[in-house]
Each structure stands twice: as structure tokens, then as C-alpha cells.
């Protein structure tokens, strides 16, 4: 953190409390810098791999949803995406509340249950996070489970029927 001398002098003299995650904690700051160094190595190869895995999963989910004629929109940011069942459209951005018309939380919840039956545990609500620990093999396994889950959804009129 830095700024004008007169402001920084107030902080240095303990006249102003400066809360934060790392103020005055050199070891923590060193850890942050080391982490950033790792993440930016090789022209940010870690991030590129995360994005490749995410792309594979998102594209695969859209393809599977079309195979079973299940309406699905995926909204995304780097490292995270949402599956919005009940809204047709594939991968796209949504800008207004009106674009959420048709979203069906029950389909999302039932999809999640079928995914769990097939060994993939998702966060509640349809949000997916992809990180550096995920591999292309993980993406393939996820899509195989998603195919089974969407098939079951379609066969059971979007309801969950336990095995």
C-alpha cells in the first residue's frame, strides 16, 4: 500500500487503524507474491489449462443438453460458470432479470442429485468452479456423468427418481 507522505505518516504513527488481510504481515505478503509468481509462470500456463478444462466442460454440457432436448443456458466468467436449466440458449451472457424467465431450480437440483449418483459432486444451485487441480480426464468423467444425469432427467420428466 502506498500514498501521499502526509497520509502514510498518519498510518505509520498509529493514528489511523488500517485493517486488512496482510498489513504489517510480511510472511503473508511473501506468500501472496510467491503464489502470484507461480500462477504467472510460463505465460500464465496454469490459467490457460483451467480455461481449457472449463471450455471442454461447458461445451460438452451444451452438446449433451441438445442431445436430450433439455433447455440450458450457461453463463460464464474465467474459472466459474452457472448452469441455468429451463432457459434455452447454450453459452451466452444474460443482462436482465427478464432473461431468467423459465429458470427451473428443480431441474438444477435434480441434475445435481443424478450427478452425485454418478460420482460428481456439484455445488448447490448450479454454479461450477474450475481450478488448477482439474484435468481433461476430470472433464471427460464429468461429461460422462452429465450424459447419464441428463438422460435420467429426460426419461423421468425432469424429476429425480432414486436408484
Q: What is the role of each PLM region?
A:
Residues 1-163:
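Conserved N-terminal phosphate-binding loop of PLP-dependent enzymes in the Aspartate aminotransferase
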Amino acid at each position: 500500500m502506498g500514498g501521499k507522505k502526509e497520509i502514510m505518516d498518519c498510518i505509520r504513527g498509529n493514528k489511523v487503524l488500517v485493517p486488512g488481510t496482510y498489513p504489517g504481515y510480511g510472511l503473508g505478503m511473501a506468500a501472496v507474491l510467491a503464489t502470484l509468481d507461480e500462477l504467472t509462470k510460463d505465460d500464465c500456463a496454469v490459467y490457460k489449462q483451467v480455461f481449457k478444462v472449463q471450455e471442454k466442460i461447458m461445451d460438452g454440457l451444451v452438446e449433451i443438453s441438445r442431445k436430450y432436448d433439455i433447455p440450458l443456458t450457461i453463463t460464464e466468467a474465467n474459472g466459474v460458470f452457472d448452469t441455468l436449466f429451463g432457459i434455452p440458449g447454450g453459452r451466452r451472457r444474460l443482462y436482465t432479470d427478464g432473461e431468467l424467465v423459465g429458470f427451473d431450480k428443480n431441474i438444477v437440483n435434480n441434475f445435481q442429485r443424478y450427478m452425485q449418483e454418478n460420482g460428481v459432486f456439484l455445488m448447490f444451485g448450479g454454479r461450477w468452479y474450475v481450478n488448477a487441480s482439474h484435468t481433461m480426464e476430470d472433464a471427460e468423467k464429468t461429461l460422462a456423468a452429465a450424459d447419464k444425469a441428463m438422460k435420467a432427467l429426460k426419461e423421468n420428466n425432469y424429476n429425480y427418481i432414486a436408484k
